[in-house]
């Protein structure tokens, strides 16, 4: 047991969560090794935009729910890892532009959208989109990972969902079929405008070119069934701000 406790003390947050899933004994050892305050810190390091609407008593459960809601554990693990050599303040145009964009997010964000950088190089951002009213995503808060290339704004950011969502234009992995970040990028576009375009997809899917053909077929031909499944996914994966851990 002492050896395991020593090993656990060197693991990162995702590895600790994975270890706790191995068996009940390991779950108990992780619980003894990691305090509630540490799980609180782990949660806000991974999800700085998370805002629970209740008094959290057990942060390990909140962390576990958020991890379970992620479509890709590997991507989650890498989402706020600063790239080696990334902190090079040489691209002043990029840095100034991103600084201005973040300032706007802080002072006058688009309705239902938030974003914040995760690293010093401004290469990894987390964003959140509130599910639009009267859509099957209403009531949900969906997290996204935004990766900014060193050549931004010449090249577009990479944007993917970090919360599972049932949608024709969003793959099971979280990839988004959005024209403005794939083929029609423009210097006039910003992170905020891209996220607004993503938000609009939640009310108006484009099924002619879908990331998930079976979901698009359901949306077109079995709308009631689609809405029911999308609402179920929203309730299960995108309401961690109100869903208490079991």
Language-model-detected regions and their locations in the chain:
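Skp1-binding F-box subdomain of Cullin-RING ligase substrate receptors
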Residues: 1-96
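Domain-scale recognition of soluble eukaryotic interaction modules
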Residues: 69-109, 128, 139-141, 156-246
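Active-site-proximal segments of catalytic enzyme domains
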Residues: 114-117, 157
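Short, solvent-exposed beta-strand/turn "edge" segments of beta-rich domains on protein surfaces
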Residues: 116-119, 131-138
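Short, hydrophobic/aromatic-rich segments at coil-to-beta transitions
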Residues: 121-126
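Short, charged/polar surface micro-motifs in flexible loops or helix N-caps
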Residues: 132-134, 148-154
């Amino acid at each position: 047991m002492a050896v395991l406790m020593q090993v656990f003390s060197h693991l990162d947050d995702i590895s600790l969560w994975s270890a706790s899933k191995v068996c009940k004994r390991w779950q108990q050892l992780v619980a003894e090794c990691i305090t509630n305050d540490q799980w609180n810190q782990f949660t806000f390091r991974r999800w700085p935009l998370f805002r629970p609407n209740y008094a959290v008593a057990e942060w390990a459960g909140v962390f576990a729910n958020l991890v379970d809601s992620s479509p890709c554990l590997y991507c989650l693990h890498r989402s706020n890892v600063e790239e080696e050599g990334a902190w090079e303040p040489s691209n002043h145009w990029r840095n100034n532009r991103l600084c201005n964009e973040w300032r706007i997010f802080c002072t006058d964000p688009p309705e239902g959208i938030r974003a914040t950088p995760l690293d010093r190089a401004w290469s990894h951002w987390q964003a959140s989109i509130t599910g639009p009213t009267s859509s099957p995503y209403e009531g949900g808060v969906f997290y996204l990972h935004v990766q900014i290339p060193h050549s931004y704004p010449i090249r577009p950011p990479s944007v993917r969902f970090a919360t599972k969502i049932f949608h024709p234009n969003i793959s099971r992995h979280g990839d988004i079929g959005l024209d403005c970040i794939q083929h029609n990028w423009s210097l006039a576009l910003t992170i905020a405008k891209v996220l607004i375009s993503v938000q609009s997809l939640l009310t108006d899917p484009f099924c002619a070119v879908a990331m998930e053909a079976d979901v698009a077929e359901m949306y077109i031909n079995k709308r009631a069934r689609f809405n029911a499944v999308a609402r179920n996914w929203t309730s299960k994966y995108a309401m961690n701000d109100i869903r208490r851990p079991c």
